[in-house]
Amino acid sequence: MSTSYCRTGEKKLYFGIYERIPFAYNGRIPNDSRTTETIYRKNMEKEIIREIDVQNVMTKSSLPVGGFSVNPYVGCPHACKYCYASFMKRFTGHTEPWGTFLDVKHWKPIDNPHKYDGQRIVIGSVTDGYHPYEEDFCRTRKLLEELKGTNAEIMICTKSDLVLRDLDLLKGFQKVTVSWSVNTLDEQFRCDMDRAVSIERRLKAMKQIYNAGIRTVCFLSLIHI
């Protein structure tokens, strides 16, 4: 019996009322009716969410780890004040403050996924593939489903425990690494720095992933003030 993890055929998220209007992406208004601008209100903050079509979600990586980089989203609602990825605004044309916008990528099915056998695929180099909106849009899960059955090496960078949802898929890959970043153990300070899940939830998720036999990494990005 199959299990459905994500909503399909429904664009309304569980935590807000929104309106949808056409928007100009890279200076033009796409013809695809799926490409829309959505304004969500959550915790008294306004976040602008767009659904966009991209030709290819895989990008040859220039990172030291090599392989390919995959970012199922542009932007990140975790809104970390120290986030290095905010430089991406220079290339995407966003004028909104970092953490207040999110582009949800829709891509064509990956052609011949076995061409990535033996390749390292880093998920979340300039976004977090498991931010709260992933619970409904499921773009990261879709990517893992498309790569299922390959010998690709999967490396996930996140601050979220939502990755536990995809444990069934992750255990199907021969080589998987899940890396969490932690900047402090002071929860009050953490709340001021980012909108990700609590440090306690991250540590509990690390333990569950580790106990499932998956290589687990904790990246300590300490903040000095």
What would you call each of these model-derived segments?
Residues 14, 21, 25-28, 40:
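Short, positively charged and aromatic/hydrophobic N-terminal segments
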